[in-house]
């Protein structure tokens, strides 16, 4: 039996990844496609313990307090545990996986900690580590949800009802978020991700419009 397909929804905070991944999985299920939606980090699992400590600021109050390679390992372990216990067998038997974040999130957020001249070297290390050494499947398609940064910040503030204390170490650091956006744009170009532009002017496009584009891209992979 041939392996399944892995489609990743990627984007910065406030881009609507969770909503679009959920809608895509529901659409495919309604079409009779064997599908499972996964989300990273897997906060319901003990495997995300180091990720939660990192995001809570227990290793430092700024993202740069934990170097890119150490932070990448926290997330990679979480993905490995999820694959072994939750979705690996389904994928190996031909199932379709829709991922809300994946190794691609490490590519975006950890690149931003490094000088740009080191980005390609880091990406080579990251993908070799997760896909070859750990044996995790590489995505068949990555769909990058691009959102204007001003709109994204407004959406994050609304998410927490104006309570800035609820933001994690990434969300609190606006300079880090700006670097992450630059890294995301680089990754989307360099790694040939599909980009869906989610804003029109100073507002988000409708969820339905964005989902239509997401479904069209998914069909290119699934046939």
Model-derived features: positions:
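NTP-dependent small-molecule kinase module
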Residues: 25, 150-223
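P-loop (Walker A) phosphate-binding loop of NTP-binding proteins
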Residues: 12
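Conserved lysine of the Walker
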Residues: 17
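Hydrophobic positions on the alpha1 helix immediately C-terminal to the Walker A/P-loop
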Residues: 20
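Hydrophobic anchor at the beta1->P-loop junction of P-loop NTPases
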Residues: 9
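A glycine- and Lys/Arg-enriched "phosphate-lid" helix/loop adjacent to the NTP-binding pocket
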Residues: 104-182
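ATP-dependent small-molecule kinase phosphotransfer cores
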Residues: 31-128, 132-134
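Pre-Walker A (Motif I) flank of P-loop NTPase domains
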Residues: 2-6
């Amino acid at each position: 039996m041939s392996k399944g397909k892995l489609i990743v929804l990627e984007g910065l905070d406030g881009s609507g990844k969770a909503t679009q991944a959920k809608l895509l999985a529901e659409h495919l299920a309604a079409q009779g496609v064997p599908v499972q939606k996964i989300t990273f980090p897997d906060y319901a699992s003990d495997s995300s313990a180091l990720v939660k400590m990192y995001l809570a600021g227990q290793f430092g109050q700024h993202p740069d307090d934990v170097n890119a390679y150490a932070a990448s390992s926290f997330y990679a372990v979480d993905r490995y545990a999820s694959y072994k216990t939750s979705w690996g067998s389904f994928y190996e038997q031909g199932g379709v996986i829709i991922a809300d974040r994946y190794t691609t999130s490490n590519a975006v957020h950890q690149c931003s900690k490094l000088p740009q001249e080191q980005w390609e070297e880091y990406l080579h290390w990251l993908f070799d580590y997760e896909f070859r050494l750990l044996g995790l499947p590489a995505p068949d398609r990555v769909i990058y949800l691009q959102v204007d940064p001003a709109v994204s910040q407004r959406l994050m503030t609304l998410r927490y009802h104006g309570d800035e204390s609820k933001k994690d170490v990434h969300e609190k650091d606006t300079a880090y978020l700006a670097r992450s956006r630059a890294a995301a744009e680089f990754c989307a170009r360099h790694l040939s991700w599909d980009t869906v532009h989610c804003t029109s002017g100073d507002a988000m496009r409708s969820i339905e419009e964005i989902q239509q584009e997401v479904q069209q891209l998914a069909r290119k992979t699934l046939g």
